[in-house]
């Protein structure tokens, strides 16, 4: 499947609008001063008040494509898949649907809309610790969708738990990350060496406190998929800098 960045943005929004989401649009790359960071680092950052329970004027199902600066990845910039600036394709549930709907929609979008081979998808889930249980619910849903048992991996908090580091009061929880082989034509690719993360579904079930975590009153979903990485796979390329986004800038 060949696709332009414009077509990818439009197809992402169209898919989630068909599931009852409203496009909230992108905000400035510069932080608004309320979150203590200079730049927007994730699509969910401007939505923090609503993820914590404030009603959003456009409803409980939202989507957009947001420009982000991710300085935490700066040492990895220059490889096949990391960028200082990138566009995050996102969608959110604010106390509405949860894991069952989200895993099904992500799988549908990747395989039916974008044509990725479901047999080659790998997915990781939270292995659990003293603060939160193993995410067997998500693993079971992945199996029901057809993800192969040997392609589902349980990983620790450092890999499959999302939170804003050091920020007390913010929502957090286990995430379900999706991976695809950097070279889909390679026979028997090995995880993780031959795979690249293309996106993740974060299940915000908790609020971070000084002493740990407490359950959120409303469970939220925060999804983020990198437009740049999706372009790589959908256009049969092996490096993000080969996409049309960098034409004229990278020889």
Show the residue positions of the predicted features.
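Alpha-helical segments
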Residues: 1-251
